[in-house]
């Protein structure tokens, strides 16, 4: 978490390097936010974070697919989405969606880690391809 001044300072020195803002982690839900002292719900917090990123002229945003529609209204640049799963196994993630759901919600890029790397990588990639081609 960072304030506007820090974001602007990072952007100022970033040169050609793209600066990407990360909103609320997909491992958090509204209950988790309250536990760590936030008085806003996830949608409110993400909206606030995106407004800061926009003011700082960041190049992209990382957010859950659950908030992509909110982010798209506020931020017209690329959106990167973690928390992608093909099944109900969420591991430590609390807010997950399928690749198709993320695409339908408007995500530009998907971060898919454990669903590929856990187990047989080739088979897992094929499962993703099959899912996307349905």
What is each PLM-predicted segment?
Residues 22, 81, 93-94, 113:
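Generic secondary-structure boundary/loop-capping signal
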Residues 67-71, 92-101:
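Short glycine-rich, acidic/polar surface loops and turns
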Residues 53, 71, 102, 113, ...:
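Conserved, mostly hydrophobic/aromatic
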Residues 11-15, 72-73, 99-106:
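Acidic (Asp/Glu)-rich catalytic clusters
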Residues 1-69, 76, 80, 86-89:
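Conserved anion-binding
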Residues 43-48, 103-107, 134:
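Glycine-rich loops and low-complexity Gly/Arg-rich segments
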Residues 1-6, 86, 95-99, 103-124:
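Glycine-rich phosphate-binding active-site loops on the catalytic face of alpha/beta enzymes
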Residues 75-83, 125-134:
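Short, electropositive alpha-helical surface patch
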């Amino acid at each position: 978490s960072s304030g506007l001044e820090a974001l602007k300072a990072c952007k100022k020195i970033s040169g050609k390097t793209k600066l990407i803002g990360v909103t609320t982690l997909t491992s958090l839900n509204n209950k988790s936010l309250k536990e760590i002292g936030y008085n806003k719900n996830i949608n409110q917090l993400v909206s606030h974070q995106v407004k800061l990123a926009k003011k700082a002229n960041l190049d992209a945003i990382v957010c859950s697919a659950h908030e992509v529609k909110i982010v798209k209204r506020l931020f017209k640049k690329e959106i990167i989405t973690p928390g992608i799963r093909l099944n109900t196994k969420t591991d430590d993630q609390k807010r997950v969606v399928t690749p198709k759901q993320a695409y339908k919600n408007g995500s530009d890029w998907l971060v898919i880690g454990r669903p590929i790397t856990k187990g047989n990588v080739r088979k897992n990639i094929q499962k993703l391809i099959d899912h996307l081609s349905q």
